[in-house]
């Protein structure tokens, strides 16, 4: 009888004891917060942005556990380890480490702009860690937009350095004017511009400049064939693009030619921040992506 009581008590204690908590994730490159319950989805914002760009996305899609990534040095976050060198690539490695160490079960990954670059990095370099990827308005080689046909990372180094230097050396007035013009060209929904502008203004000038130069020189086209997860790419032509819709579609098809299974879809009547300019369309695309 005593043995039975002892075993019963041990069983009760085992059930009542809390599971061992996961060690908190520590990084000097990214800060991650989680919202909701359900299948895991990693959301990565773009250059000089914050997870605030995903607020409506989270609201529109209950039933998922969203992992909101904030890069150090952007939108008021401490610079941390992003003091020198590349910004996107090291942060992408930290996202992959986060997925592994926090035991996420092959999450979906959605990245906007530079976040899209990082999503492709994770998918190509850690293909077993993700289930599917959505890239929001980003090419595998952004530098192609900054030079003549046939430009390479090597040939664009002077351009990238010139842009980096001009961003770092801009005074307050010049920086404010540049940010206002840039945001106006990226978001046609006027009411949504202040959010993105505030994030950009709060970003570290040097970190943003190095990240932009890094994006110009990052050519992921040779790595696309390493992506085994389904890839969806949403893109826009944009008001200021000196090309037709058909030309932009052709440009994206050519850029992703080594990944023929990728789903490429142009979103009309939108600039770079599709989630702001076409919120209903964007919500529908994300819903289809997550459910597929």
Describe each region flagged by the PLM.
Residues 2-42, 61-65, 105, 260-263, ...:
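Alpha/beta-hydrolase fold catalytic core
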Residues 30-80:
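Conserved HGGG/HGGXW glycine-rich cap/lid loop of the alpha/beta-hydrolase fold
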Residues 35, 67-110, 114:
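Active-site loop/oxyanion-hole signature of alpha/beta-hydrolase fold enzymes
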Residues 60, 230-231, 235-270:
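Conserved loop-alpha-helix segment in the C-terminal half of the alpha/beta-hydrolase fold
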Residues 105-147:
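Conserved hydrolase catalytic core segment
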Residues 133-169:
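Flexible "cap/lid" loop of the alpha/beta hydrolase fold
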Residues 145, 150-151, 166-225:
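Conserved alpha/beta-hydrolase catalytic His-Asp/Glu region
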Residues 270-279, 283:
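Catalytic histidine-centered segment of alpha/beta-hydrolase-like enzymes
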């Amino acid at each position: 009888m005593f043995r039975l009581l002892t075993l019963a008590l041990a069983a009760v204690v085992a059930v009542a004891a809390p599971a061992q908590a996961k060690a908190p994730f520590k990084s000097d490159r990214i800060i991650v917060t989680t919202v909701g319950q359900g299948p895991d989805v990693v959301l990565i914002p773009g250059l000089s942005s914050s997870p605030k760009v995903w607020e409506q996305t989270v609201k529109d899609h209950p039933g998922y556990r969203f992992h909101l990534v904030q890069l150090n040095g952007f939108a008021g976050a401490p610079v941390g380890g992003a003091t020198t060198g590349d910004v996107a690539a090291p942060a992408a490695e930290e996202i992959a480490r986060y997925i592994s160490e926090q035991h996420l079960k092959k999450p979906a990954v959605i990245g906007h702009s530079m976040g899209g670059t990082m999503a492709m990095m994770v998918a190509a370099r850690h293909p077993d860690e993700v289930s599917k990827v959505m890239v929001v308005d980003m090419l595998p080689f952004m530098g192609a937009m900054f030079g003549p046909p046939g430009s390479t990372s090597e040939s664009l180094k002077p351009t990238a350095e010139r842009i980096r230097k001009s961003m770092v050396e801009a005074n307050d007035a010049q920086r404010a004017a540049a940010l206002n013009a840039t945001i106006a060209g990226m978001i046609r929904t006027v009411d949504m511009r202040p959010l993105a502008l505030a994030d950009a203004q709060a970003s570290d000038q040097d970190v943003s400049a190095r990240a932009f130069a890094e994006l110009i020189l990052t050519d992921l086209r040779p790595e696309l064939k390493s992506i085994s997860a389904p890839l969806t790419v949403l893109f826009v032509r944009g008001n200021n693009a000196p090309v037709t819709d058909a030309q932009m579609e052709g440009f994206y098809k050519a850029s992703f030619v080594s990944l023929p299974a990728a789903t490429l879809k142009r979103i009309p009547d939108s600039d770079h921040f599709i989630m702001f300019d076409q919120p209903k369309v964007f919500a529908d695309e994300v819903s289809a992506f997550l459910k597929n």
